[in-house]
Amino acid sequence: MTIFIHGFGSSGQGSKANLLRDYFKSIDRPFIAPSLSYIPKLAITTLEELIESYNKVNLIGSSLGGYYAIYLSEKYNLKSVLINPATNSVQTLKRAISLTGYAPNFYDNSSFEWRESHLEMLKEYNRDRIESNRYLLLLQKGDNVLDYRDAVAKIPNATMVIEDGGTHQFEGIERHFNIIEEFLEVNNN
């Protein structure tokens, strides 16, 4: 089973999730992309329950989903693909606490309350420098939210694809589906 973990303010129905869902369906491999709570502890609990429900699991995490995937990969010894991952979510998402205290939900343009207590929860899931080679990093230097060099420094032994240009959403992710499949060895599960 491959589980896609979406980013902050996104959902399991986002564009990357849908592209990946269609790809995994085309190769007849199990895939889920749950829509997770914005509350970190609830999101992690949901993901832990899913991981513990399946025999063999791989993760694909994007942005905040990459941060969660690092924590879960280290806890459960899983392979993960990280797409422009947030490696220091506490610092990055501190910016999301606006004057109103609300952050946007990109699925339906609603908003949700994002507070300091949520940042405190995120701290529980931080992992320092990762020496494992169980990771594939897909990074675009043009990411306007995160500095790709932070992920390179945090997970120096990862397999890496680093592209010039691009965006935080990672333009052209479908060009890398074969690399993702090969790295996760989904055909051998």
State what each model feature region is.
Residues 1-54:
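Active-site catalytic motif of lipid deacylating hydrolases and related acyltransferases
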Residues 55-58, 134-136:
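Short active-site oxyanion
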Residues 79-189:
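The alpha/beta-hydrolase serine catalytic core
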